[in-house]
């Protein structure tokens, strides 16, 4: 067992693959992202395979998650946002399952790596930009000039708004990766202290550890929610030019 709190984030090659000079090896990160996808698909398949008038607990939980995402889109975008339910729902579920899977002992948290979260963030960024130009054409560029801006202030505001827009995928990805990494490092460090304290305090430190794990699960769910709701807000900017 390793004692370094950062060792849990090490990328390990499982299958070495090279394509056109690029390293596309199958790693522990790959397998946990694949596992998260399989678990999510299995969960919703079992929940909706035999839908009942009186739903099972599994079906109820799946419907709650679906309605949560649908409400996010409805509140942020309105009726026009319904067509994006598959995208936003898939995004939320993938991040949620990756986060929760990383809470199991000796597992790997794919969303603690900036390359994973940045890929998701840049996907959202590109879709938002494409949707904006497809729907509004060049009028989408008015997003970078707030309504009512004085003419003399327009050049500065355009630069600021453009920089803010381009920084979206960076802030979106860093927020998720940093929170997941910080939480897991904290748990690892405190778990090490807990084992040592049990020698002197018996089982007293265990409730503290349980509370911290519960809090980290809450953070895992919250971070998936925050990433998704910010994506909805960005989509709203592209669709309604707010």
UniProtKB/Swiss-Prot annotation:
Coiled-coil positions: none
Membrane topology: Multi-pass membrane protein
One Pfam family per UniProt: ATP-synt_A
TM annotation in the entry: 29-49, 84-104, 114-134, 140-160, 181-201, 203-223
Cell inner membrane recorded as keyword: yes
Classification via SUPFAM superfamilies: F1F0 ATP synthase subunit A
Main location: membrane
Compartments, as annotated in UniProt: Cell inner membrane
InterPro entries reported in the protein's UniProt record: ATP_synth_F0_asu (IPR000568), ATP_synth_F0_asu_AS (IPR023011), ATP_synth_F0_asu_bact/mt (IPR045083), F0_ATP_A_sf (IPR035908)
Any one GO cellular component localisation term in the record: plasma membrane
Keywords: ATP synthesis, Cell inner membrane, Cell membrane, CF(0), Hydrogen ion transport, Ion transport, Membrane, Transmembrane, Transmembrane helix, Transport
Molecular function in Gene Ontology: proton-transporting ATP synthase activity, rotational mechanism
PROSITE patterns given in the database record: ATPASE_A
Sequence similarity: Belongs to the ATPase A chain family.
PANTHER family for this protein: ATP SYNTHASE SUBUNIT A
Subunit note: F-type ATPases have 2 components, CF(1) - the catalytic core - and CF(0) - the membrane proton channel. CF(1) has five subunits: alpha(3), beta(3), gamma(1), delta(1), epsilon(1). CF(0) has three main subunits: a(1), b(2) and c(9-12). The alpha and beta chains form an alternating ring which encloses part of the gamma chain. CF(1) is attached to CF(0) by a central stalk formed by the gamma and epsilon chains, while a peripheral stalk is formed by the delta and b chains.
HAMAP family: ATP_synth_a_bact
Biological role stated in the UniProt entry: Key component of the proton channel; it plays a direct role in the translocation of protons across the membrane.
Classification via NCBIfam families: ATP_synt_6_or_A, PRK05815.2-4
This protein's name: ATP synthase subunit a
Organism for this UniProt entry: Rickettsia rickettsii (strain Sheila Smith)
Organism phylogeny: Bacteria, Pseudomonadati, Pseudomonadota, Alphaproteobacteria, Rickettsiales
Gene (name only): atpB
């Amino acid at each position: 067992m390793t004692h370094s709190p950062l060792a849990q984030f090490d990328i390990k090659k499982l299958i070495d693959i090279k394509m056109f000079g690029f390293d596309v090896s199958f790693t522990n990160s790959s397998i946990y992202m694949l596992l998260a996808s399989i678990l999510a698909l299995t969960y919703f398949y079992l929940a909706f395979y035999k839908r009942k008038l009186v739903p099972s607990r599994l079906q109820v939980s799946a419907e709650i998650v679906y309605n949560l995402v649908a409400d996010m889109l409805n509140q942020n975008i309105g009726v026009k946002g319904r067509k994006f339910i598959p995208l936003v729902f898939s995004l939320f579920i993938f991040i949620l399952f990756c986060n929760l899977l990383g809470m199991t002992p000796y597992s790997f948290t794919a969303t603690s790596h900036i390359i994973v979260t940045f890929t998701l963030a840049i996907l959202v960024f590109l879709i938002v930009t494409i949707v904006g130009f497809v729907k509004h054409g060049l009028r989408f560029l008015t997003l970078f000039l707030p309504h009512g801006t004085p003419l003399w202030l327009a050049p500065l505001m355009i630069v600021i708004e453009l920089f803010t827009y381009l920084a979206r995928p960076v802030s979106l990805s860093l927020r998720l990766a940093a929170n997941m990494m910080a939480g897991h490092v904290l748990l690892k460090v405190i778990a090490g202290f807990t084992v040592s304290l049990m020698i002197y305090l018996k089982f007293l430190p265990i409730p503290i550890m349980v509370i911290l794990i519960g809090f980290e699960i809450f953070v895992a769910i919250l971070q998936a929610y925050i990433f998704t709701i910010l994506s909805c807000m960005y989509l709203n900017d592209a669709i309604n030019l707010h």
